[in-house]
C-alpha cells in the first residue's frame, strides 16, 4: 500500500509514478479530493469537541453557582454538539474507508533506475549466460516430445480438469519432483535460505496484505463458501507469515524458500501460449522471499536474482536477464528483473523467473515492521522471486537436452536425483 502521508505531502511523486506506468492519474485526483474532505471533517470534529469541552466547564460553573436552569440549557446544547459529532464521525469513517479502497488500487512507485517504457517491448536486457544450442537435426517442441515418450498427456489433463492442465508420467513426473528437490537443496544448502512448508489455501487478508487483492481478484481461484483462496504463488503465505509483527533489525534479512503448487485462472491470457506447459492453471514453483531493511533492499534484490540464476547455470540452460520498464512493471513492484530461459520451440527466451523488490508496499499493507538500532519502528522491505518455475524448467530441459532419437539427456546435476542419465521410451 502507498504511504498516504507521502501522497498528501508530495502528490507529484505519485502523479509521476502513475504516468510512468502509462495509467490514468484520475485515481490520484480522487484520493486527494477524498483526503481533503476527510481532513476538513476531522478538523470540524476537533473544533466541536473543543466547544463541547468548554460547555462542560460552563455546566460545572453553573452548578457551582446553583444556576440549574442555565446548567440544563448548557447540557442540552452539549448533547446537540455530541449528536453533531457522531454524525460527522460517521461521514468521516465512510470517507476513510473510501480513501482506503482507493489507496489499495494505487500501484507501487517505480524505483528511480527503472527504465521508462510503455510495455515489454521496451524492457532492457542486462546480461546473458550460455549460448543457445545449435542442433544438427530439427528440434521438436515439448508438446510433441512429451507425448511421443508417453510421459506428457494433454488430452487426459483436459478430460480431468479442462484446458491448461497436464498429466506427467514416469520419468517426466520424476523430473518434476527431482527439480523441486534440487532447487530447494541449492537454496537451503548453498544460499542460506530457510525452507518453509506453507498452506496453499489462505484467507482473504493474506491476499490483501500481499497486494493480490483487490486488483487481481478475477485471476484468483476463490473457495466462496469459506472465503479462502488457492495461492497464486508461495510469495503470499511467505510474506504474510510476519503480518502484524514487529521484528528485530538484528534478525534481518530473513530469507525463506518454499515449494508449492500455484493456481491462476489466467483470466487475461486468452490465446497466449495455448500449446504445451508454458501457461498452466496449476503449476509448481519454488519461491524465494526476503524480509530486509530499506537501506539494503536493492542490493538484496541483486543477490536474490543471482540465487535464481544459479539454478539455470547448474542446469546449463542458456538464459538472459532483463530489467522491466515502467509500463511492464507489476502492481506491487518497485523494480523487477525477469530471467528468461531459451526455448527452441519458440526460438526465443521465455520468462522462467521474476525477481522483485516491493519496497514497503506489501509491508505497509501487512504491517510488518522492525525495531531499528535507533529504537524506532520502521517498515521492512519485502522481496520475492521464483527460484524457479518448475514446469517451465522441465520444459526447458526437455527441449534443450533432446536427442535426435527422441530421448532426453538428464542434466548432470540431476542424475543423482533421477537415477538415470537419459529419459527414453523403454
UniProtKB/Swiss-Prot annotation:
Subcellular location: Cytoplasm
Any one GO molecular-function label of the UniProt entry: serine-tRNA ligase activity
Highest taxon above the source species: Bacteria
Keywords for this protein: Aminoacyl-tRNA synthetase, ATP-binding, Cytoplasm, Ligase, Nucleotide-binding, Protein biosynthesis
Enzyme Commission number(s) from the entry: 6.1.1.11
Reaction(s) this enzyme catalyzes, per UniProt: tRNA(Ser) + L-serine + ATP = L-seryl-tRNA(Ser) + AMP + diphosphate + H(+); tRNA(Sec) + L-serine + ATP = L-seryl-tRNA(Sec) + AMP + diphosphate + H(+)
GO cellular component, one term: cytoplasm
Main localization, broad class: cytoplasm
Statement: the UniProt record of this protein carries the keyword ATP-binding: yes
GO biological process: selenocysteine biosynthetic process; seryl-tRNA aminoacylation
Binding site for L-serine: 233-235, 287, 386
Matching CDD domains: SerRS_core
Stated family: Belongs to the class-II aminoacyl-tRNA synthetase family. Type-1 seryl-tRNA synthetase subfamily.
HAMAP family: Ser_tRNA_synth_type1
PANTHER family in the cross-refs: SERINE--TRNA LIGASE, SERYL-TRNA SYNTHETASE
This protein's domain notes: Consists of two distinct domains, a catalytic core and a N-terminal extension that is involved in tRNA binding.
Name the UniProt record assigns to this protein: Serine--tRNA ligase
Species for this entry: Thermosipho africanus (strain TCF52B)
Record gene name: serS
Amino acid at each position: 500500500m502507498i504511504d498516504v502521508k507521502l501522497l498528501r505531502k508530495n502528490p507529484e511523486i505519485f502523479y509521476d509514478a502513475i504516468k510512468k506506468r502509462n495509467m490514468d492519474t484520475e485515481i490520484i485526483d480522487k484520493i486527494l479530493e477524498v483526503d481533503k474532505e476527510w481532513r476538513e471533517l476531522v478538523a470540524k470534529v476537533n473544533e466541536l469537541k473543543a466547544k463541547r469541552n468548554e460547555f462542560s466547564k460552563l455546566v460545572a460553573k453553573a452548578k457551582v453557582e446553583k444556576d440549574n436552569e442555565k446548567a440544563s440549557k448548557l447540557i442540552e446544547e452539549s448533547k446537540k454538539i455530541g449528536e453533531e459529532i457522531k454524525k460527522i464521525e460517521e461521514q468521516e469513517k465512510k470517507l476513510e474507508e473510501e480513501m482506503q479502497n482507493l489507496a489499495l488500487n494505487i500501484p507501487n512507485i517505480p524505483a528511480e533506475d527503472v527504465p521508462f517504457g510503455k510495455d515489454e517491448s521496451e524492457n532492457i536486457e542486462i546480461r546473458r549466460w550460455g549460448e543457445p544450442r545449435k542442433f544438427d537435426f530439427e528440434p521438436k517442441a515439448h508438446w510433441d516430445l512429451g507425448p511421443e515418450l508417453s510421459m506428457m498427456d494433454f488430452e487426459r489433463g483436459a478430460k480431468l480438469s479442462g484446458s491448461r492442465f497436464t498429466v506427467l508420467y514416469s520419468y517426466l513426473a520424476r523430473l518434476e519432483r527431482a527439480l523441486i528437490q534440487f532447487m530447494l537443496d541449492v537454496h537451503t544448502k548453498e544460499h542460506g535460505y530457510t525452507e518453509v512448508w506453507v498452506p496453499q489455501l489462505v484467507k482473504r487478508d493474506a491476499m490483501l496484505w500481499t497486494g493480490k487483492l483487490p486488483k487481481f481478484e478475477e485471476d484468483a481461484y476463490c473457495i466462496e463458501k469459506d472465503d479462502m483462496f488457492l495461492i497464486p504463488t508461495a510469495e503470499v503465505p511467505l510474506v504474510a507469515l510476519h503480518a502484524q509483527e514487529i521484528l528485530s533489525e538484528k534478525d534481518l534479512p530473513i530469507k525463506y524458500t518454499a515449494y508449492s503448487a500455484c493456481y491462476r485462472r489466467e483470466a487475461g491470457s486468452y490465446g497466449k501460449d495455448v500449446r504445451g506447459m508454458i501457461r498452466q492453471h496449476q503449476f509448481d514453483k519454488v519461491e524465494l522471499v526476503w524480509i530486509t531493511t530499506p537501506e539494503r533492499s536493492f542490493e538484496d534484490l541483486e543477490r536474490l536474482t543471482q540465487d535464481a540464476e544459479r539454478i539455470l547455470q547448474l542446469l546449463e540452460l542458456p538464459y538472459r536477464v532483463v530489467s522491466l520498464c515502467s509500463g511492464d512493471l507489476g502492481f506491487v513492484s518497485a523494480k523487477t528483473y525477469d530471467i528468461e530461459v531459451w526455448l527452441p520451440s519458440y526460438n526465443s527466451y521465455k520468462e522462467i523467473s521474476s525477481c522483485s523488490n516491493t519496497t514497503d508496499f506489501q509491508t505497509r499493507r501487512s504491517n510488518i515492521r522492525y525495531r531499528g538500532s535507533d529504537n524506532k519502528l520502521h517498515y521492512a522491505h519485502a522481496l520475492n522471486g521464483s527460484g524457479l518455475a518448475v514446469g517451465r524448467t522441465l520444459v526447458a530441459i526437455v527441449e534443450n537436452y533432446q536427442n535426435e532419437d527422441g530421448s532426453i539427456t538428464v542434466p548432470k546435476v540431476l542424475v543423482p536425483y533421477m537415477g538415470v542419465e537419459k529419459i527414453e521410451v523403454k
